[in-house]
Amino acid sequence: MTSGTKKIAVIPGDGIGTEVVREGVRVLETLKELRGYPLELWHLDLGADRYLRDGTTFPKEVFETIRTECSAVLLGALGDPRVPGLEHAKDILFGLRFGLDLYCNVRPVVCLADRLMPLKGKTAKDCNFVVFRENTEGIYVGMGGQFKRGTPDEIAINEDLNTRKGVERVIRAAFEFAVQTGRKRVHMADKSNAMRHAHELWYRVFFEVAKEYPQLEAKHVYVDAMCLYLVQDPSMFEVVVTCNLFGDIVTDLGAGLQGGLGMAGSGNINPGKLSMFEPVHGSAPPLAGKDLANPLATVLTVGMMMTHLGWPEEEARLTELVRDAIDTMNCTADVGGKLGTRAVGDYIVGRLRG
């Protein structure tokens, strides 16, 4: 994905999303200026402010333009207490995730400095793995319902949807990623000992696909055991693939190993196709407008996007600059520094120019 102009839809969203995306955009504009990358940034006025102003959530014509003209989407964060039903957030997030079939939620869990590692006897080098979370199926699809609500006989059901197609493609993506990045081991985390139908499918398909990658070690782990191992020895993991629900849980545990959500980038990816990239953290309304938000997750996310667009050398470069910002304390308070959001962005951009 390297030929021609790359149009990037930019959706800052709500709360601190607008502040961290501003710094991500500055990084992109600097890369474009210095390296001559054919990038076109399309800034979209979507979020809680727009919804409260005129009721707009995610217009169909905007989605169609994204689908047909863009190479990537950079999203900040969505969520605002003035919109308790999250109507705008649901339309934007689900519209992109399902409309673009972004079936891989890819979450690098990389600790970039020893001082950020919370585990006794471990260092940053012990935490470097990537989680592939299935992103379009599972218990989050919303199948189910309630019966006799508000009574002593109330029943609530959520159904866990797993298709062979959905399971196989995210597992295959994890193996392909391991091959492409020189990793040697892929774990699949499930609860097939308890979820004997849905996760038996995961178990069976994982080892069927693994036969196509004899150069890789394919290992199964129950997700509860994985949580134990993550706080004992995270170095045992290189690539992990799991379902939607479990991926949501283990990646937040992973964020605790890398310095918090302010250090966690992510991609919602359809391999080889238009994909969406966002920092993991939320909109954090209490922090909005105070220049306190950590933009480094967004910088790392921009790096992931550059790899997706065909320039992996820029992800490596941005990762090293983030490492340098942490090492030199040119960072926000959540990771031990004293700088504000804008000043951290200034530091990263300055180092790019340096």
Located regions from the model:
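Glycine-rich phosphate/nucleotide-binding loop
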Residues: 50-52, 229-330
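Buried hydrophobic positions in well-ordered alpha/beta secondary-structure cores of metabolic enzymes
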Residues: 14-17, 71, 132, 174, ...
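Glycine-rich phosphate/diphosphate-binding loop of Rossmann-like nucleotide-binding domains
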Residues: 9-26, 30-32, 151-224, 236
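N-terminal beta-loop-helix "entrance" segment that forms/cooperates
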Residues: 34-60, 228-230
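Short acidic loop-to-helix transition motifs that present clustered carboxylates
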Residues: 114, 221-228
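Glycine-rich phosphate/pyrophosphate-binding loop and the adjoining helix
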Residues: 142-188, 192-196, 317, 321-354
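Buried hydrophobic packing segments
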Residues: 24, 28, 206, 298-306, ...
